[in-house]
């Protein structure tokens, strides 16, 4: 009898009905599709470059790791305001949404200008940080050359990327997830087509190698920006915030202060987290250029599978954030419990598929056998820890939806710099432990975060409306 009651209680707390899952999937699936297609095309892009040569692939992958830091800076910069956007939309306060949009604009402009200046001045030195491991002088010189070629062109794509993130994040926070997905699909098709034409020099197009890949990416970003911006302003009946959006670019001082208080830790968090990921890759790269190549392969494959827990985490921020903005705390907690459980269950299934297929993916690349073998085991290790990452991602966005950005800052970037990076740094430089063991130790350390996240979510420290005043 008691077991029956326990099962009933468990189902009520963690399992939703069909209507609940349809609601969650309505938000999550478009994000999954957009991110999935993006990452799948990144995979194809990666394979296309990889077929030219290992040095070209490694050079482009190092630059993409550096640009990833910028991408997350933008994500962190707009996400701080996004907490307010979701709650303003929950209150149907369209002027509040406009003001948060304007804040996002200025924050993104500042970050983009700073990033372009940084890469123009010390870009070559940053690439060289990843070329200190084993490898011939010629291999290192070629990797640096191709990386610099790729970087110089990719910088032209930062402004449209910035605008896409500002508009798409605002649309999603207002419940419109389909249009950003459609724009992403079109951009991806453009990217894939011109990758093929420009990397290999098909028809009358020149054979540009890594430069062709960069040009295709930049072109696709301008196409995506044109679609998202154009659609938003043509459909003001659906996007009420777009009416009079640029009548002024001023942001009220009191709102700026509130967003900075909540959003600055989030910006620092994303920036420090992304730079920590770049540092982890640099630590692994000490073990040689084959490790750089294998990490590029495994990370590209991992990103295709990670879309599930990333999209479900984003859905937590949107759905729970709107419930908090509407003041329905009881429903917010109940919804959050079910969404976390759903994310972990989904990712357990995905991880099984990923683990079984891990030996097949590296075979797609034209690289040496050692790099392929390393990539296979890196993918397997990541698959094993995917349910853990799903739980962490969902709890992170739960805390963030309630404005607990200081906690997420400590929970995320402070942890990775104080625990994960030191583990990788010490083990890679001062021991003879195999790089796969180092990689697994870094993943295992995140169990500490699981415990912290579980306690904080259960205590309900995130249950608050931050825009009611």
Language-model features: where?
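Transmembrane helical elements of multi-pass membrane transporters/channels
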Residues: 26-45, 153, 187, 220-224, ...
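Helix-terminus/linker motif at the lipid-water interface of multi-pass membrane proteins
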Residues: 36, 40-58, 127-141, 199-208, ...
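Short runs within selected transmembrane alpha-helices of multi-pass transporters and secretion channels
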Residues: 78, 153-172, 180-188, 213-229, ...
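Short alpha-helical transmembrane segments in multi-pass integral membrane proteins
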Residues: 1-28, 85-157, 207-263, 320-385, ...
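Hydrophobic/aromatic residues within transmembrane alpha-helices of membrane transport systems
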Residues: 33, 45-49, 60, 85-90, ...
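Small-residue-rich hydrophobic transmembrane alpha-helices
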Residues: 57-117, 161-180, 281, 292-358, ...
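Generic alpha-helical transmembrane segments of integral inner-membrane proteins
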Residues: 32, 36, 40, 44, ...
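Small-residue hotspots at the loop-to-helix junctions and early N-terminal turns
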Residues: 54-65, 147, 151, 214, ...
């Amino acid at each position: 009898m008691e077991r029956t009651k326990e099962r009933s209680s468990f189902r009520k707390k963690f399992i939703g009905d069909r209507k609940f899952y349809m609601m969650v999937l309505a938000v999550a699936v478009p994000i999954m599709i957009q991110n999935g297609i993006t990452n799948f095309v990144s995979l194809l892009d990666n394979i296309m470059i990889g077929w030219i040569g290992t040095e070209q692939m490694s050079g482009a992958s190092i630059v993409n790791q550096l640009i990833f830091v910028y991408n997350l800076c933008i994500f962190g910069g707009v996400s701080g305001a996004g907490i307010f956007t979701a709650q303003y939309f929950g209150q149907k306060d369209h002027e509040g949404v406009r003001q948060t949009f304007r804040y996002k604009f200025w924050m993104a402009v500042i970050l983009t200008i700073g990033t372009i200046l940084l890469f123009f001045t010390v870009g070559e030195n940053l690439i060289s940080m990843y070329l200190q491991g084993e490898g011939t002088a010629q291999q290192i010189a070629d990797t640096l050359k191709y990386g610099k070629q790729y970087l110089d062109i990719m910088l032209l794509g930062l402004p449209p990327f910035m605008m896409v993130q500002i508009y798409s994040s605002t649309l999603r926070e207002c419940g419109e997830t389909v249009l950003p997905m459609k724009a992403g699909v079109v951009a991806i098709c453009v990217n894939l087509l011109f990758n093929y034409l420009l990397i290999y020099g098909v028809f009358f197009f020149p054979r540009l190698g890594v430069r062709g890949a960069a040009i295709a990416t930049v072109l696709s970003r301008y196409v995506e920006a044109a679609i998202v911006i154009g659609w938003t302003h043509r459909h003001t009946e659906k996007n009420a915030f777009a009416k009079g959006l640029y009548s002024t670019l001023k942001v009220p001082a009191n709102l700026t202060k509130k967003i900075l208080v909540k959003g600055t830790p989030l910006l620092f968090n994303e920036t420090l987290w992304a730079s920590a990921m770049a540092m982890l890759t640099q630590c692994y790269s000490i073990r040689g250029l084959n490790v750089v190549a294998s990490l590029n392969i495994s990370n590209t494959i991992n990103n295709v599978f990670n879309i599930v827990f990333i999209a479900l985490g984003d859905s937590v921020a949107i759905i729970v954030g709107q419930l908090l903005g509407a003041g329905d705390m009881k429903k917010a907690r109940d919804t959050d419990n079910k969404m976390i459980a759903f994310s972990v269950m989904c990712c357990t299934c995905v991880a099984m598929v990923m683990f079984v297929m891990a030996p097949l993916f590296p075979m797609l690349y034209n690289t040496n056998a050692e790099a392929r073998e390393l990539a296979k085991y890196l993918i397997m290790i990541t698959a094993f820890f995917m349910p853990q990452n799903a739980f962490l991602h969902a709890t992170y966005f739960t805390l963030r939806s309630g404005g607990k950005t200081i906690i997420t800052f400590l929970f995320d970037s402070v942890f990775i710099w104080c625990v994960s990076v030191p583990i990788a740094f010490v083990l890679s430089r001062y021991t003879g432990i195999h790089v796969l063991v180092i990689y697994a130790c870094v993943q295992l350390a995140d169990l500490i975060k699981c415990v912290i996240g579980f306690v904080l979510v259960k205590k309900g420290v995130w249950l608050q409306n931050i825009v009611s005043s």
